[in-house]
Amino acid sequence: MSRVRLEGIVIGGEDPEEGNAPPAASPEEIGALRERAASALEAGLVFIEAHGEELTRLRVRTLLGAETRETCAAEIEAYQADNGSFPLLGLARGGAPGLAAARVAGLAPEVLGTLEALVALSDLGLHHHPCIDGAAVFLQSIQADDGTWGASGGPPESRLFATGMLAGLLGRTRVVRPELLEAAGEYLGSIFNPEKISGRQWESLTAFGVFFTNVGHDLADSALQWIGRELERGYRTRAYDAGLTVRTLLHCQSLAVPGASLDPALLLIDLLAEQATDGGFAEFSEGNDATRVEPTLDAMLGTILLSRAL
């Protein structure tokens, strides 16, 4: 295993500008938290190297700076079919929140695989990689008349997660056709209401959050306020642990969601407390160690970004 250089990975931003509110923690406390985060990344890497699939191991090494983003993206692109779709890349098998449930619910493998590819590229910050063009063409070719993706025949809500995630992730790119987003937006706007995201409804909350964060829509401002409040409420009442809360923020590509006031330092402390002694996260989830790999990768990426925000 090549050594991952963690120096600098978890260095936070510059000191607050004059006139801004002082940080809640002292410099010594922030420094100690960064050191703890670096140790957590080392332990998480060991866990993923032991239990993760080959592509997942490459992804985590890339996030830690041991491999280039171009190398990882090329490996992902190599799986792409001629029609622009992707086969299953292992995120659902690794226990990725939402994706694992979509797999069980019967989302077509080529649709789920394409969603996995978009998530993996998004985590790397590669929203404009050339292979996304083909993925967008494929997804538009199979988009249902009502603007959704997912198993046909069920209630509209059964297609919410796939539709919100796919349209939201594509909304960050430069290649998606407006009519694809408009059709998905008409569907999502027609079913959105606060009850859809309250309580333990992480998939719905996250799918709506990703879509309304990245796609212009008449409901976006008000919906994001509800989403932010429900995310914070779910986190503070422990309906969602820190890992799930962070994964929503990662999908939305933002540590600041309207309506939510989540302190990066406190969220990082809670996240690190969820790491098990074997270095992995989601210790009490169903399944074996292999299904804890993606939650561990999520927590590691969250650790990096939260540490930079200190």
Name each model feature, range by range.
Residues 1-310:
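Preference for long, amphipathic alpha-helical scaffolds in soluble/luminal domains
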